[in-house]
Amino acid sequence: MGPRCSKLSLCWWPTHLKSTHNEASDLDNGTDDLPSFTEFSFDQLRAATCGFSTDSIVSEHGVKAPNVVYKGRLEDDRWIAVKRFNRSAWPDTRQFLEEAKAVGQLRNERLANLIGFCCEGDERLLVAEFMPFETLSKHLFHWDSQPMKWSMRLRVALYLAQALEYCSSKGRALYHDLNAYRILFDQDGNPRLSCFGLMKNSRDGKSYSTNLAFTPPEYLRTGRVIPESVVYSFGTLLLDLLSGKHIPPSHALDLIRGKNFLMLMDSCLDGHFSNDDGTDLVRLASRCLQYEARERPNVKSLVSSLAPLQKETDIPSHVLMGIPHGAASPKETTSLTPLGDACSRHDLTAIHEILEKVGYKDDEGVANELSFQVWTDQIQETLNSKKQGDAAFKGKDFVTAVECYTQFIEDGTMVSPTVFARRCLCYLMSNMPQEALGDAMQAQVVSPEWPTAFYLQAAALFSLGMDKDACETLKDGTSLEAKKHNNRN
């Protein structure tokens, strides 16, 4: 199991720690705009997650996890994270409600706050703020363009300590399975602690899903989590931040005991931190990883130790992280146009306004052969049908619009994807989703790479209750829209 850290003698440990830090209560501001804790219906959450689509899964092990986390979007456009527990996790409804409501009372800018729950039949779900910019694991272990900067790593450690201190001050000192997947980044690039780890049920699997090499010693002995166990896990996270790797504590402590702690440091950080700074963080990690729980620091002293180490405090997190401020995360984007967004929300009024505004621009190159045709009375009559249909469409006389557009289509002289799109919406307005789906598919046949055809298919599929298929079709429309946008550039 490795050496007992309590036997490790490091003469440069401080005898006491200064308490110069922001109190947890100072961080309660900035959360007034959060909604109150709410009960959601299962249907609401199913719709928000596109029928709990596999494409909406954001949790670590995907669909194989016992409890899966999905990203979702509510009718008011709020993004949420939805944790759906397996059916055996919370057999006691009362216990689930009590736990959820207790965690739901917490409000802090260092947390991804719990904003709601659902408890219907055997279903148990939690709803939290959605954090768009991935996990600490992603940014630390699987980065794409740049490794995490030293000053940002120090900030992550401090913000996490502040989150734990706040929770402890509110009577929620236990956090289950604290690891790099539990640290999430918000729209400003600030790290936050997931609220999901604050709830635990005796039947909800193990408190630690990670390798036993990273598990607090007392948990291995007793199977119980105590506040000091959370500090131990915090120590393993400090090792992650120091090394950029997931190093077993026993190996790290061997290096520290041999005064080779610089070998722990991430090679990407060479030249970007002082030895004193590295030493201070290693000291703190060592104290957190003491074998005896009583010898570990409390969360308040973690904040005291980390606050003086902060660097570049005037630089916003999104700059340190290389995230363009105000940029939409890929996880937040379901459509690239207002039409796609309106179809995803099944806002028929907005769809009508957009189709009316766009007119027949998208028919260019598809239905513009008329100038090369011989003008006949039949063609003129066909054009008159379309013109009458357009007038009815503009005036929201959808029954007349269907009749006129149908005459135009059945004449067969000309083909217009926009006419199919307009008649599709008329059918949706008339509560005829099956006919609407047929027209949207015909529009796709005429113009195979027209995003509008896919978006309208999605709107029809939503009307038919086929949410999963609708989300897939929205995704196809989004891909075509992105391709179209890239070709322009």
From Swiss-Prot:
GO terms for cellular component: plasma membrane; plasmodesma. Its EC number is 2.7.11.1. The modification Phosphoserine is found at residue 209. Pfam families: PK_Tyr_Ser-Thr. A lipid is attached at residue 2 (N-myristoyl glycine). It comes from the Eukaryota. Keywords: ATP-binding, Brassinosteroid signaling pathway, Cell membrane, Kinase, Lipoprotein, Membrane, Myristate, Nucleotide-binding, Phosphoprotein, Serine/threonine-protein kinase, Stress response, Transferase. GO terms for molecular function: ATP binding; protein serine kinase activity; protein serine/threonine kinase activity. Residues 55-321 form the Protein kinase domain. Induction: Induced by salt stress, drought stress, cold stress, brassinosteroid and abscisic acid (ABA). It is found in: Cell membrane. It catalyses: L-seryl-[protein] + ATP = O-phospho-L-seryl-[protein] + ADP + H(+); L-threonyl-[protein] + ATP = O-phospho-L-threonyl-[protein] + ADP + H(+). ATP binds at residues 61-69, 83. Interacts with BRI1, BSK1, BSK6 and BSK8. This is Serine/threonine-protein kinase BSK5. The lineage of its organism: Eukaryota, Viridiplantae, Streptophyta, Embryophyta, Tracheophyta.
